[in-house]
Each structure stands twice: as C-alpha cells, then as structure tokens.
Amino acid sequence: MGNLATQPYDKITPAMRTRYLSLSPYNLVRVILGEPGPADTSADNVYTRASDCLAEWIDGGILARDREPGVFPYFQEFTEPDTGERLVRKGFIALGGVEDYSAGIVHRHEQTLSGPKKDRMELLRHTHAHCEQLFMLYPDPAGAVDALLDAASAAAPLAEVEDEYGVIHRVWKIAGDGARNIQALMADKKLLIADGHHRYETALAFRGENPGLEGADRVVMTFVNMHSPGLRILATHRLVNNLAADDFPGGFLRAAQSEFRVQPIESLRRLKQAWTAGGPTAIGAAIGQALYLLEDRQPAGELDVRVLHERVLGKLLGIGAEAVRDEKHLRYMRGLEAAVEQARTGAAQAAFLLKPVSVEQVAATSFAGGVMPQKSTDFYPKLLSGLTIYKL
C-alpha cells in the first residue's frame, strides 16, 4: 500500500509526482494528478488517461469493489511539528451525503476558487470516481463514536502505511451492526469541512449535472470528532514581498502605531508568551533581523488572521483581497522558525507570524455561516489518498 497511496493532489509537487510514478505502475497519482503532455488533445489528455487508467485497474482486478457495506476506522499516528508531541488522530472513512450549504447540515469555513474546481470537475466527469476523501469534522463531546472506533482498533489493521513525513496510517473495517451503530450516532450531526472545500463543491456541481446518476449524491469522507485530542491545526504564516522599499519598514511601523502597540522583541519566546496569555490579538512581524510584537489597541475578539488580513495587509500595506487571492505580494509558510528565516535572509521583506486558530474558533465561524481568510487553517496531518476509492 505504501507504493500506491499519495498525499492529497494539491500537496503533490512535481518532484513528488515523479517519485510516486517510480514506485508502482498502480500508484494513484496516475489518476489524480497525471502528467500533461505537449501533444494533448480533447481526446487524449490527463483526464482521459486517468479514466482509462482507472478502468484498466478495475478490469484487470487490481482494484476490486468491496461488496460488504461498512465503515473504515482510520487512525493517523504523528508527531506535532511545533511541539514534538506524539499524537493519534482518530476518524473513520465512509460515504456522506452531498448537501447544499443552505440545508444547514454541511458547513464550510473557506471561500473557494474557480480554477481548482474546474480541474477536479473534469477529472470527476471522466472517471466517475472519488479517489480522495473529504476531511469532515463532527461534534461528539462524549466520544461515543470514538469508543466504537477504539474497540475496532484492537484487531490487526487491514492496512498500515508510513508516509514520507513519518505519519503512520492504519485502517480497519467495521461491518454489520457495528457500522449501523455508527450510522445511528452520526444521523443528527452537523458537519464542518476541514479540508476539501473545492472537491465538495465539485461534488455538488456534479450531482446537479447528473440528477439520475446513482451515487452522485454521495462522496467519500473521513469523519473526525472535533473534540478529539489528536486533532491539530497548525499556523500558516504570511510572507510579504514586492512592497515599495522606500517606505518599508519605517513607514509601515509608524503607521502601525495607530492600530497596534508595536514592541521590538528579542526572541520568539516573547511572542509565544503573548499567545499563551490569551490576551488581545498578538501578531508577530519579522523584518530583516528584527522581531516585533503587534498587540491590538482596541481588541474586538476577532480572529488574529482576520485582523492581519484586514488591518495589517489591507489597511496598512495596501494588499487587498484581490491581491491576496492572486498571491501578488503574499506567500504562505508552515513553521515559525522557517518563516522568520525567510525574513532574516531577505527571501521575504517581512514575515507575519500567527497563532494557530483553534478548532472552536473554526467551528464558531463556520456554524454561524461565516468564512475565514484563505489558508487560515492547516489541519495536520493530511489524509492519505488511495486508501479507499468510491466508484459511481
């Protein structure tokens, strides 16, 4: 299985794709992220080749449909990058209904872009298959579903894979009454999309295109209890470039004084202390060799990432929503020290450093019908693609 599964399609670099292709002729990357060619036509392209590839695997017995309904407990054992803590995130893979947001069952927390949806729609139209799970959160503070998953995990897993990041993925199966018990416990749960907004909205559009196609109203999902101790969100820091050098950083720091208390700090420890204290919005700024702490003068309980986008990037630096969307001045980076190093080496004019948002903040925003700025959440680790495939 380790030679067949991949990271999610939007996390696969060209180098990773090359490595996946070398591992096995049956690696899923051939379906979810094929290589375009200079001679591609409407009759021969990445999407037609993906469809042909999947059909060949099914016809040749490489892939076989599981005839017994069930759900698949899916545990991920990992090391939290920022703390070094060893954790297990527990969830299960199953089919979930594709519901309009207006129904109040499935909730989003991000806006989507048209480009990724167009690409995934073409793949879905050609393959009629969902090859990657959507990552969904559900509320279960009592842990009733987790208890059933724990019981199933006492047996040997059906599959165990260690990925390139050292994450160990294990999958089991629950059938019969056990699966029905989980269905019953999940029947009234609201769902929050953690990862996979573009693919969820692609599935919505595909359902609309194919009202008579059996199974088009469902998609494969991994469900994780939002109260699970293994659920982690990492911060995604903002790297800024292409600002007018004649007024940066001096002009920016002076202007920021009207909105924030701007304090030079000696180390990241002071920033982490401000985050731990749980006071007003505290944003770090690494500019060259200097570090600054920006504390909101008039905190209103807004998310730090929203304050950064609206009042720092937008108001003070003139990087509006369209520029953010087009990434004209902005790059994103995981890892506090790595982001600071970008500023210190001059690879970025500034690195703005954010405290990770909490699951509670994401849920409160989403269930209230709101959305967060792009790349506000980085749920870690990512779900492995290729563990299950849902063929319509």
Locate the predicted segments by residue:
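Surface-exposed, charge/polar-rich loops and edge strands
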Residues: M1-L392
